[in-house]
Amino acid sequence: MSENERGTQLTEEEKEELQRGEKGAIIELLVPLENYLSAGVHIGTHTCTRYMERFIYRVRPEGLYVLDVRKIDERLRVAAKFLSRFQPQSILAVASRPYAFTPVQKFAEVVGARAVVGRMVPGMLTNPYLEDFIEPEVLLVSDPRTDTQAIKEAADMGIPVVAFSDTDAKVDYVDLVIPSNNKGRKSLALLYWALARQILRERKEIAPDADIPVKVEEFEVKLSQ
């Protein structure tokens, strides 16, 4: 077990707490708590911006910020409801961080959205004379710290932005934050999988308790052998 993993281990009491709402009642998460934890969606960084403080569950003795899984789950639901209101092809999902490439591409495939991974061509959202010009109605980004070009252009065009945001995120021009570990391979896979499934549920394309035929593992970037 790495030092980072030891720093994010939760006690049984903490796990019990994370399965209860503000009034102490058991809450139903989109994904079983253990699945969230094993994927590391709650693992933050050693830095926390003022806006992201509201999503923090604990600060470990070594200074590592740990996100509240309940708030991650809640924002996934809110984001899914919001994104489900748009026509699939009007949703643009982008990722400049390599670990997000496969999750974004699979997400787009499942929900019918567009995907742009890697370097985004400047002017893609703002220059109608550009060959790659597109006009999305909403933008989903994997990391506000690395997807800055997309966020800036969306802001210039009045396009709402939904962003997976770690504890160190600067969320200027982001309209809806999904607190999350947006740097981990398994975390990104689970987050995009859960969001895709919930969007289909919100659209009533699948039953409220149904799964999608694509497994979480298929959303995960495969490490080179």
UniProtKB/Swiss-Prot annotation:
Query: Has the keyword Ribosomal protein been applied to this entry?
Result: yes
- Taxon lineage: Archaea, Thermoproteota, Thermoprotei, Sulfolobales, Sulfolobaceae
Give the family from UniProt. Belongs to the universal ribosomal protein uS2 family.
Q: NCBIfam families, alphabetically?
A: uS2_euk_arch
* One Gene Ontology term, aspect cellular component: small ribosomal subunit
**Which biological process terms from the Gene Ontology are attached to this UniProt entry?**
translation
Which InterPro entries does the UniProt entry name for this protein? Ribosomal_uS2, Ribosomal_uS2_arc, Ribosomal_uS2_CS, Ribosomal_uS2_euk/arc, Ribosomal_uS2_flav_dom_sf
What is a single Pfam family found in this protein's UniProt entry?
Answer: Ribosomal_S2
Q: What is this protein called?
A: Small ribosomal subunit protein uS2
> What pairs make up the disulfide bonds?
none
GO MF annotations in UniProt: structural constituent of ribosome
Top-level taxon of the source organism: Archaea
- Mind listing the UniProt keywords for this protein, alphabetically? Ribonucleoprotein, Ribosomal protein
